[in-house]
Amino acid sequence: MLIVAFKPGHDGAVAAIGDRRLLYSLESEKDSRPRYSPILATTVLDLAERLGEVPDVVALGGWSDLRPNRISYTGAGYSGIEEPTVTTSRFFGKEVKFFSSTHERSHIYMALGMAPRDDSPVQTVLVWEGDVGAFYVIDGHQRITRKVQVMSGPGARYSFLFGLADPTFPTTGGKPRLNDAGKLMALAAFGDSADADADITHVVERILKQDSMYPAPKGEYRDSVLYNAGVESPECKIAAALLTERLFETFAEVARQEMPEGSPLYISGGCGLNCDWNSLWAQLGHFSSVFVAPCTNDSGSALGTAIDALTTFTGDPHVDWSVYSGLEFVTDTQPDPARWTSRPLEHDELSGALAGGRVVAWVQGRWEIGPRALCNRSLLAEPFGAVTRDRLNEIKQREDYRPIAPVCRVEDLGKVFHEDFEDPYMLYFRRVRESSGLRAVTHVDGSARVQTVRDSGNPQMHRLLSAFAAQRGVGVLCNTSLNFNGEGFINRMSDLVLYCESRGISDMVVGDTWYQRAEG
């Protein structure tokens, strides 16, 4: 059975599952399109070119848009856990099953289908994102038996705090911005919730109790200490730490009281990208295990709708998948030989260049699904100097308070971090050992968001890390996404060359070829 699913709205994507295996998950923002792009015709054509047949099932994820005088619905709509609709339709001349289920269900089934198989009689799913904030009990037949509502819009509330402090965010008519949550997560590390005074605490509690964040009610907070205070102000940093703490406490208390103890927890929705919260869920002790998919936000929604369809027709949501299920790199041009030389990749020599302070644009295989660069579309650099962090943020044209993540081979985890658990998708924080000297990748609170690498998971990166370890003692590098500011991952040679030449990067690796900027 071949299933093709479409995700409307922001973070547009298409996904294809064939015989219970993820074939492709293609986000329209990738290949240097604007972040959060709606589904593009080119994305659909990219998938159609690579599939050998017309699908048996066409699945449309639900969505809704807030218009000036009404709500416009696509497919099954945004909210709800009602049973999907299945009808017969035609698709390019072939009779197909047409399937549609809500956006809320796409998050639930994305988590269920990507999680490891578990024979527990019940499972718990948490969906927390821009609009939905609820737990779900799943029975042994993969059916939703209970929904426990916690809070509407946890992600929107979190993002709103950033907009409240940001003088550039409109006072009326705005919506919480999709990219603000990650920035607030970075700022929260600079603050301490214990420093919150009565004014800051009052604002945070107001945000938690606000009826709706659409449109963002910034004007109602004109009298608050946080109104246009500046996102790097002490007040904003303290409030960010407090809101981070209070949101988690609210959901954790419901989990302890309402959700089956000892069940596995599967986390879905954009809040699943918050490494602080993921770490706290893992430490809670109420659940037997915690799973977060690399595409836990809306980048995995098309895949979730496809899995929902698979479950409807087969009774089993589980799929075989790889995080590297995007498109292969496109060689649409060759670097100008007058400006670039090429040579076969030698890992030992490249690690020497990295140890000497060079920044390397690193491209391998198919792009990663989800928003995190997992060493197939990455900028790499040595991890020891704070100046390296500043240089990478300058290259990426982003705020200097943003941390740089490390990639570490599993053999070195215990040497440089206090916790040595594996995290191949970069979804949890851990504490950096002060003796490691990893200043470029240590955030202000002593934490790091680490991608761990095994030889079996990413052999090219593991080999490079091993070569770097032979020279510098540990297999750790800076690893940040290879993209123009405000765009998805770079995926073609013309964009890669433009990026490197415009940002002073002299080394590019594509597959087994190392390109170096010619001197002179």
UniProtKB/Swiss-Prot annotation:
Gene3D superfamilies referenced in this protein's UniProt entry, alphabetically: 3.30.420.40, Carbamoyltransferase, C-terminal domain
Coiled-coil spans in chain: none
Top-level taxon of origin: Bacteria
A GO biological-process term: antibiotic biosynthetic process
UniProt cross-references to InterPro entries, sorted A to Z: Carbam_trans_C, Carbam_trans_C_sf, Carbtransf_dom, NodU/CmcH_Carbamoyltrnsfr
Keyword Transferase: yes
Molecular function (Gene Ontology), one example: transferase activity
First and last residue of the signal peptide: none
Pathway as given in its UniProt record: Antibiotic biosynthesis; cephamycin C biosynthesis
EC number from the UniProt entry: 2.1.3.-
Assigned keywords, A-Z: Antibiotic biosynthesis, Transferase
Assigned protein family: Belongs to the NodU/CmcH family.
Function: Catalyzes the carbamoylation reaction in the cephamycin biosynthesis.
This protein's name: 3'-hydroxymethylcephem-O-carbamoyltransferase
Species whose genome carries this gene: Amycolatopsis lactamdurans (Nocardia lactamdurans)
Gene assigned in the entry: cmcH
